[in-house]
Amino acid sequence: MSQSLEEKSVQERTRIKNSRYESGVIPYAKMGYWNPDYQVKDTDVLALFRVTPQPGVDPIEAAAAVAGESSTATWTVVWTDLLTAADLYRAKAYKVDQVPNNPEQYFAYIAYELDLFEEGSIANLTASIIGNVFGFKAVKALRLEDMRLPFAYIKTFQGPATGVILERERLDKFGRPLLGCTTKPKLGLSGKNYGRVVYEALKGGLDFVKDDENINSQPFMRWRERYLFVMEAVNKAAAATGEVKGHYLNVTAATMEEMYARAQLAKELGSVIIMIDLVIGYTAIQTMAKWARDNDMILHLHRAGNSTYSRQKNHGMNFRVICKWMRMAGVDHIHAGTVVGKLEGDPIITRGFYKTLLLPKLERNLQEGLFFDMDWASLRKVMPVASGGIHAGQMHQLIHYLGEDVVLQFGGGTIGHPDGIQSGATANRVALEAMILARNENRDFLTEGPEILREAAKNCGALRTALDLWKDITFNYTSTDTSDFVETPTANI
């Protein structure tokens, strides 16, 4: 007997249902999270992960699992997938390459539909990209190496509150790096002695002095006391030198209300710049960036806490991603490495950080760790800050590696000068101006740097003392985050 039309219809619906839905646990790669034929769209958010699969886990399945767990998947198939445009909203791992000279690690390229992310929210972006997926058992270790944020998405962020160009115009300082100093010791000084340090450093020739990351409002010096003494010092130094001076007043606090109060007093006292720490969190950073833009203040970000997740090469997140997120969030300054100082910083990788903060467009450069072309959609530039173990004798190296759009912060290299803080500041200023003059005369200042400094020191006792004290001290430790990015064919295994 032939089947009725109704029976055929039921069978067809059953067939379609079975083809679309399978209960239980299915490999992520078979659920649509792996698609080597996927054509990347200009509007896709792209992420590059360094994946170390657990022993026995196929790298393609590991990449698909990362895509799934950072987008729409859970550990089992759910029938409510049929109520959404699942094929659209699934992240797609579309390329997997073995890391050169490391058979246990793989670069996994993953594309995300733009509609998966709330506009203008770093918190929402990070909840997906670095959320639960980093604790997923299928991967032994996972590191977010780079991202491409599409033009349309970047346009939903305000970007830096002030930017490099406007900052230079406000300070009336052009054609050279800015000079700074972190007050030392970072903890324990009274407000009055703290202000004395600030005055001496600024009067000696520095442009900025700063609070360190953990100076907030402790029993030995409450924040109002510090602000009052510091701004008195800033104003006196500005009057004595005829230059615009500043001090990064750290407004980091336990609550947003308290941060607002501290920032407001800084503004009322005439400060041109305030400071926050990375550890306050992405939402607080964006919130203070909005306040800074609304109140015409420069916003300095200290990357306190960054190395807890960025320093290890196989797990965590590369600092270049933080650079991108912070440019979107709206900070004006961020510590980005010195190359020659005491903190982590491979020269080639650090160059990639500086490009990320300063260029209007990024071009793919695997050696520098830049995996994607990316247009910054006219967002303002962020001023990189170099600090940690640098001194006047390295001035030629600093300018060679870092260029002129940078704040060079000499903490111990100013306050540790045997003749006092003002002499330390003067030594740094004279060294900088001598090197900039040599650069402008088209001299090979990197090679001739030591000679240029010795010549300048003949007319500056403070610089001569600094060179005699620190000589050619450099922290030559091997970086843990070196370049291993070379072009390799896709291994769709």
Swiss-Prot record:
Traced from the root, the source organism's taxonomic lineage reads:
Eukaryota, Rhodophyta, Bangiophyceae, Galdieriales, Galdieriaceae
GO cellular component, alphabetical, reads: chloroplast
InterPro entries, per database record: RuBisCO, RuBisCo_large_chain_AS, RuBisCO_lsu_C, RuBisCO_lsu_C_sf, RuBisCO_lsu_fd_N, RuBisCO_lsu_N_sf, RuBisCO_lsuI
> Tell me, how does this one assemble?
Heterohexadecamer of 8 large chains and 8 small chains.
What reaction is this protein's catalytic activity? Answer: 2 (2R)-3-phosphoglycerate + 2 H(+) = D-ribulose 1,5-bisphosphate + CO2 + H2O; D-ribulose 1,5-bisphosphate + O2 = 2-phosphoglycolate + (2R)-3-phosphoglycerate + 2 H(+)
Q: What are the S-nitrosocysteine sites (modified residues) in this protein?
A: 181, 460
Q: What EC number is given for this enzyme?
A: 4.1.1.39
> Could you identify this protein by its name?
Ribulose bisphosphate carboxylase large chain
| Key words of the record | Calvin cycle, Carbon dioxide fixation, Chloroplast, Lyase, Magnesium, Metal-binding, Monooxygenase, Oxidoreductase, Photorespiration, Photosynthesis, Plastid, S-nitrosylation
> Is the Magnesium keyword given for this protein?
yes
Q: Which residues bind Mg(2+) per the record? A: 210, 212-213
**Site (Transition state stabilizer): residue numbering on this chain:** 342
Family, similarity comment: Belongs to the RuBisCO large chain family. Type I subfamily.
Give the UniProt subcellular location, in the record's own words. Answer: Plastid, Chloroplast
Q: Which domain of life is it from?
A: Eukaryota
Which positions in this protein are listed as binding substrate? 132, 182, 186, 303, 335, 387
Question: What this chain does, per the record?
Answer: RuBisCO catalyzes two reactions: the carboxylation of D-ribulose 1,5-bisphosphate, the primary event in carbon dioxide fixation, as well as the oxidative fragmentation of the pentose substrate in the photorespiration process. Both reactions occur simultaneously and in competition at the same active site. Carbon dioxide and oxygen bind in the same pocket of the enzyme in a similar manner.
The free-text cofactor remark is: Binds 1 Mg(2+) ion per subunit.
- Cofactor section: Mg(2+)
Magnesium in keyword set: yes
Q: Which residues carry this modification: N6-carboxylysine?
A: 210
The record's principal subcellular location, in a coarse class, is: plastid
Q: Which HAMAP family match?
A: RuBisCO_L_type1 (MF_01338)
GO terms of biological process kind:
reductive pentose-phosphate cycle
Q: Where is the active site?
A: 184 (proton acceptor), 302 (proton acceptor)
Output the CDD domains linked to this UniProt entry. Answer: RuBisCO_large_I
